């Protein structure tokens, strides 16, 4: 199992406050990695969990989202990564395009059958990233949210 950092929060000095950009960051969907088409028919099992709450499942590649942070003026206590406001805050992060490209590159090069994404409690960041991966790139993936 290889663990990859999603993002180093020490670089996130500017942060993001929901409403500043009116939620209109235009993510350009990637179609190729290293001149090869992205396999959007790829079937992947994606697991999400919270490192402080759950035992990690066995995965081929694991992405650590504990240091990834976004800011929003919405109270997220009653929300989770399935909610659009959480996913929009991830997409509107100033480094989203770079981060998603790194994740897709790892998947396309290493051809994992299972990937994991974890954050602290398994409710917001890991769930949001997994849902975005499925919605934007790997529609046939199956997601298991251990923390929900």
Spans of features found by a protein language model:
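Histidine-centered active-site/metal-ligand motif
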Residues: 25, 124, 145
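Short beta-strand-centered segment that lines the nucleotide-binding/catalytic pocket of NTP-utilizing
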Residues: 142-148
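Acidic, low-complexity, intrinsically disordered interaction modules
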Residues: 10-11, 15-29
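A short beta-strand micro-motif
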Residues: 4-6
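Conserved beta-strand segments of alpha/beta enzyme cores
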Residues: 45, 140-142
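Catalytic cysteine-centered active loop of the rhodanese-like fold, especially the PTP/DSP P-loop
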Residues: 103-138
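C-terminal accessory "lid"/substrate-recognition subdomains
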Residues: 21, 30-113
């Amino acid at each position: 199992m290889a663990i990859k950092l999603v993002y180093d929060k020490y670089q996130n000095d500017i942060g993001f406050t929901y409403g500043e950009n009116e939620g209109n960051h235009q993510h350009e969907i990637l179609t190729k990695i290293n001149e090869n088409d992205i396999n959007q028919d790829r079937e992947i099992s994606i697991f999400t969990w919270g490192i402080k709450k759950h035992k990690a499942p066995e995965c081929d590649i694991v992405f650590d989202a504990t240091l990834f942070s976004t800011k929003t003026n919405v109270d997220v206590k009653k929300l989770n990564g399935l909610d659009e406001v959480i996913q929009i805050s991830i997409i509107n992060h100033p480094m989203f395009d770079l981060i998603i490209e790194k994740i897709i590159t790892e998947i396309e090069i290493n051809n994992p059958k299972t990937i994991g994404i974890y954050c602290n409690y398994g409710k917001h960041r890991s769930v949001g990233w997994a849902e975005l991966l499925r919605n934007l790139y790997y529609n046939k993936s199956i997601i298991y949210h251990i923390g929900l």
